[in-house]
From Swiss-Prot:
Pathway the protein takes part in: Lipid metabolism; fatty acid beta-oxidation
Keywords noted in UniProt: Cytoplasm, Fatty acid metabolism, Isomerase, Lipid degradation, Lipid metabolism, Lyase, Multifunctional enzyme, NAD, Oxidoreductase
UniProt xrefs under HAMAP family: FadJ (MF_01617)
Quaternary data: Heterotetramer of two alpha chains (FadJ) and two beta chains (FadI).
Site positions per UniProt: Important for catalytic activity: E118, E140
Annotated organism of origin: Escherichia coli O127:H6 (strain E2348/69 / EPEC)
Designated gene of the protein: fadJ
Stretch list, region 3-hydroxyacyl-CoA dehydrogenase: 306-714
Compartments, as annotated in UniProt: Cytoplasm
Source superkingdom: Bacteria
Role according to the record: Catalyzes the formation of a hydroxyacyl-CoA by addition of water on enoyl-CoA. Also exhibits 3-hydroxyacyl-CoA epimerase and 3-hydroxyacyl-CoA dehydrogenase activities.
GO cellular component: cytoplasm
Listed EC numbers: 4.2.1.17, 5.1.2.3, 1.1.1.35
This protein's name: Fatty acid oxidation complex subunit alpha
Amino acid sequence: MEMASAFTLNVRLDNIAIITIDVPGEKMNTLKAEFASQVRAIIKQIRENKELRGVVFVSAKPDNFIAGADINMIGNCKTAQEAEVLARQGQQLMAEIHALPIPVIAAIHGACLGGGLELALACHGRVCTDDPKTVLGLPEVQLGLLPGSGGTQRLPRLIGVSTALEMILTGKQLRAKQAVKLGLVDDVVPHSILLEAAVELAKQDRPSSRPLPVRERILAGPLGRALLFKMVGKKTEHKTQGNYPATERILEVVETGLAQGTSSGYDAEARAFGELAMTPQSQALRNIFFASSEVKKDPGSDAPPAPLNSVGILGGGLMGGGIAYVTACKAGLPVRIKDINPRGINHALKYSWDQLEGKVRRRHLKASERDKQLALISGTTDYCGFAHRDLIIEAVFENLELKQQMVAEVEQNCATHTIFASNTSSLPIGDIAAHAARPEQVIGLHFFSPVEKMPLVEIIPHASTSAQTIATTVKLAKKQGKTPIVVRDKAGFYVNRILAPYINEAIRMLTEGERIEHIDAALVKFGFPVGPIQLLDEVGIDTGTKIMPVLEAAYGERFSAPANVVSSILNDDRKGRKNGRGFYLYGQKGRKSKKQVDPAIYPLIGAQGQGRLSAPQVAERCVMLMLNEAVRCLDEQVIRSVRDGDIGAVFGIGFPPFLGGPFRYIDSLGAGEVVAIMQRLATQYGSRFTPCDRLVEMSERGESFWKTTATDLQ
């Protein structure tokens, strides 16, 4: 039986050809190599029909135009030459679309990304909807690649080189109003008239290119170009620390096209695409993409989730306010916040107002939509309005007795089916549920701060949590736009447990005389978004260190922090950015004017000696402890798989994505090399570096955590 076509041609009575994109059996349109013959057959029909006046590409999917190319095509390439051929085939197809003698218009609704935008760029004009779902971008850099079907050449000529570089180097996605302002699209219309607007444009002569702003024209010239690429190159190097080769190749390819012409530019683009596809960085980033996609499809348990119609939140603090925001504004669920103090409720409501008002100011959201979303959030100082809530998220202080009291109150004031989810970061869920009448409906739901930005949540069932409670909580997390991993109810869960020894070691190096800025710079160079000391300042020194005694009590000496250091810092009223006193100096209202270390910190913690470690040595000490603890978590079934372990570290603490996560990084080094490094460090610095049994066994057997395929585990 012949497979249904992803591209179909229909000719209207007014002689406008409509090419409908609808990949069979898929929610999202993605471009695959086998579609090229379908498109070429349509192009042939269009060329043969001399009556046609214009062509419109439109998607049949409800919320996407084309979300990009199928990444599996790249994974199937065994050599750089094969990947280069793939890029050249894409370039050729786009060139054939662009060469059609009649106007070709892209009618865009929903995601128009990667290869989808490259197809739209090959058209002569573009119309998009004003819907919030409509975004346009070239996110290939986030996979360690560059646009390979002409995007690096067409985009700079359409919107200007500096604007195009910003889009390509960051993967930035534009909304409709931004796109039309920059000249990326010709018109923005309501969804209801998208097709007709595109048809009207197709009936006219080919849309003429909008003149570029004077600034962009100057930057495209030889002198402006030299200055621009030097400046952008420096900025990019500082941001990536040289860890992402794709950014360097993007600059090279775009500059080649501008200096030597499009023919040389396309050639450079295809070669760079092929070479980047084979880099370990791209392979790791693509593996993270696949693992993330799998996690988002994982229901958490085999049981069907219960209905979710409304949510309650206990506590209107920073976490409670953030959770209310993602529940109402991302999940679209009515939220009722309970706080003992009206000020807490006001704080939570203001939090959502500030987030939404910011979107209105940036023209990402209409004021009417802001008001509609805010109307989903209400507050109370008692349990009025909680009787029929399906799930309650507790976000009160980290106090076991208080949380147990919250369980009792929810069971007394809510329905018998109501799930109680605790946002604890350190307390065992089994202890929180110890006196519950319905312990099967108690679970942990650990968000990370700031809630609206951090993509990960840990879902923590205790021994008696039901499968349906797990599935329902996973369902909620996904609705909130989060990536959930299910972890075992052990001290520190997963993310905080692997983070603690990493931070402890940084503090220990401080006491040995290493400078704060040297330690942080070393870990940023390694690939973390911020260093461990700055991270403590950002999350709050009191908050970040509160779990340390819990972990030391559970796992022993390897989690012990340097004696009296943390207490000395806290006793000096240093909580980090939030109170303007931490390891770093802060300006008014806790804002940093320029990041500078507070020199008073060194005598305060009793730092001894002069630091002599190189940046790689500093990073090695912190990272090896994190890797070792991640393997212990896998061994103890704290995490269900190495997939979850890698996703948890990358999305939860910013483990360098280009390394693929702790387990992929161990595989890239080899278990034998990791064991050898740790044994050397154990000899130098103590038994906390002793490699765990599983690593030693894997080293002896030559085993790895991941198979060579993109997503399968051993």
